[in-house]
Regions:
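Extreme N-terminal, non-catalytic leader segments
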Residues: 2-3, 142, 146-197
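Cofactor-cradling patches in redox/metallo enzymes
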Residues: 31, 38-144
């Protein structure tokens, strides 16, 4: 499988136009040792120019969400072949909401394990997209990755109005991650820059 079609997609976000890649966290869910699928998706994401923080297999919701927050990721991609996916994905959405990070988009798949009714339920709950075997047949692997990239590119990036005074307290670490991203993307106003000095 070649990711060349993804790499040829025109950058659609301001950050991508500046050459700054999207950031994804990838993992297989808790008690799931089936990491072949997520490894393939991770490699295609990387081939498309996405920065990937790969957690491998058997990862808890807390680990995945905390990593996404600390890395200021735009997307999370999870494979789940072990069952328990409805609760797992809902908990991911819940923890992101609790952290004020609903801008992080959640994607997943699990072959035929996640049935159409569950896909509908989870997407209504807040999962951005769950890919079925039918999607794989119609879109192909690269097409699914292109869809993920497009959905994250159109999304809201981190709030760059984080001030130095907001780097303490419960959300201090999350705000610090957002601030670092804003600095990397050269998105701070002169006033914001001077408040950090």
């Amino acid at each position: 499988v070649s990711a060349s079609t993804s790499a040829n997609s025109a950058p659609s976000s301001p950050a991508q136009k500046k050459g700054i890649p999207l950031r994804f966290v990838t993992a297989a869910s808790l008690f799931d040792g089936h990491d072949a699928a997520i490894n393939i998706m991770r490699r295609i994401l990387q081939g498309a120019g996405v920065e990937v923080i790969h957690l491998a297999h058997n990862r808890s919701v807390a680990e995945v969400v905390q990593t996404a927050l600390q890395e200021d990721a735009q997307g999370i991609a999870i494979s789940s072949y072990q069952g328990g996916h409805v609760e797992y994905f809902k908990y991911v959405v819940d923890l992101l909401k609790e952290a004020g990070a609903e801008h992080i988009k959640v994607f997943g798949g699990g072959g035929g394990v996640i049935v159409p009714a569950e896909i509908k339920e989870l997407e209504a709950y807040g999962v951005e997209r769950l890919y079925s075997p039918y999607d794989g047949q119609n879109l192909g692997l690269v097409g699914m990755i292109d869809d993920m990239i497009e959905r994250c590119s159109l999304g809201t990036y981190s709030d760059v109005t984080v001030a130095a005074t907001e780097l303490s307290g419960d959300n201090g670490r999350n705000n610090l991650a957002r601030l670092i991203t804003a600095i990397e993307r050269d998105e701070l106003s002169p006033e914001q820059q001077s408040s950090l000095r």
